[in-house]
Structure formats: C-alpha cells, structure tokens
C-alpha cells in the first residue's frame, strides 16, 4: 500500500502504521487509564491517523475497545466514572444501541458534549446528557425496550477525562421483561459478537465481584472469540460489596483474562465523582482483605 499523503501535506506511512496494530500480550501492570495510556493509547493514536486516511474503505479492520457485560454488572458506573457524566439508568436495558464514547481531554474549563446520530449533531451538557442519550436512542431504536445495532456517538471534551474511545454495548439479559422482545437475548448476542469477533477488537469485560465469573454470559461470549484471553481486559466492579475471595478470584484467573484484572468500587448514591475516587482509594488501602490486592490493579483512575 505504501505511504499515503493527505491534502494538507500531513504524511503517514500506512504500512508502518498497520505494523504497529498488534495487541501486546503481556500482563496488565496498572489501573485502567494508566494501562490505556501506556499500552493501548499509542496503538489507537495510530488508528486515528489511519482513519483519517480512510483506510477502512479498503477493507482493513482497525482496533476498537468494546465494552461488554451482563446486565447489572456495573458497566454504566465504570463508563460514568471515566467520562465524569451521568448515563441513562433504570430498570431493564439502559444501553439499547452501540454507544460510541469519544473522550478527549481539554484545557478549557467548560466541558463540550454532543451527540451524533441520524446525520445530525446535537449539543448537550452535563445536566441533560442522560436525557439526550435516551431521546437519541428512541429515535434510533424506537420507543420501548427494543435494541438496534445502529450506533450513537457521544463526544465529551473535559479537562479531567482520559483521551479514550470505546464502544459500549447493551448489557446481556436472558429473560425478556417489561415489554422487551422475546428474542432480546439473541438480538444482543448478535450485536456483541459482531463487535468482538474481529481480531482487532480489544474486549473490556465488566464483571461484578458479587458473582461467579465462570457463570457470566459476557465471559462465555468473549471466550468464544478470544479463547486465550490475549485481547480481553476485565474490570471487576462492586469490590466493596464482595471483598471475600476477590483476591483469589483475580489471582486464579479461572476465566483466562489475558490482559489482566482491574478492581474498582462503584460510585454510591449522591457522591460526586471526585468523592467516589477518594473513597475508592481509601477502601483499597485500608480494607483488611482488599488492601491485599496489588495496588497496580485497583482503581478506575
């Protein structure tokens, strides 16, 4: 394919760029954002440059961080903590379409937040972003509890977020409730497999500390496409709710998480994101059981 040149004289060697798009198969050595900055971000920076060259039009798959988890695994809490904004909450499926979250660190004191869907850009703000996501989802997937594989893009520019792009997928549920389609499990499964099957996808599997990891449907799906776990990273939520045996769970690694585990405490009640992080740090430093977990694999930030 050789080098390619943009009209603004910005030059990238596409072959060299593609050669760097390999998943590093070594143990994870830092919490989620540090791990991202050290190992995944350089890869995705290359991806962004290649996207600017429209290489996907040539049929080349580019890496994506795909967030999966069973319903009620705490997936929304993890994403909220990373973005510092509220996402839709409630009973049933909160995420009904693929939500492409683009976080960008900004020096401006005022955050910029907008949605992109149906060929339009819709500005919003921190107070109304959850409502805006719900409204956009209704446009894409219809009102009710159905799902759609048409993506919705959420862009967030703030001074306290990591530079990070992820695709959040609906939580996995086996039993339809509250008017959900009878085949809701099959619909969500197809959507998830579509995103995690490509070898270029990095799977961020959100697991609740309160359950047996081997019974998680998200683990079963990710192991179908990544048997050795070489491109799977696990975030273990609700560590404060089930501290007994958590160290053994992440040490034994019965479910083959090749990129390692990160244990976190979910935000509780009316805590601000800053307060939640302080309490998380205190928990993992002082709890008689959780303090035994390596400090390099605890904490969302």
UniProtKB/Swiss-Prot annotation:
This protein's source sits in the domain of life called: Eukaryota
Question: Which protein family is named in the record?
Answer: Belongs to the TRAFAC class dynamin-like GTPase superfamily. Dynamin/Fzo/YdjA family.
Q: Which GO terms describe its molecular function?
A: GTP binding; GTPase activity
Q: Which SMART domains match?
A: DYNc
The entry's keywords? GTP-binding, Nucleotide-binding
Q: Name one Pfam family in it.
A: Dynamin_M
Q: What is the designated name of this protein? A: Putative dynamin-related protein 4A
* Segments forming domain Dynamin-type G: 59-301
Region: G2 motif; residue ranges are 94-96
Keyword GTP-binding attached: yes
Cellular component GO terms, alphabetically?
A: cytoplasm
| Record region (G1 motif) | 69-76
- PROSITE patterns (UniProt xref): G_DYNAMIN_2
Organism expressing this protein natively: Arabidopsis thaliana (Mouse-ear cress)
Q: Which residues bind GTP?
A: 69-76, 168-172, 237-240
Region annotated G5 motif, chain positions: 270
Ranges where the record places region G3 motif: 168-171
User: Where does the record place the region G4 motif?
Assistant: 237-240
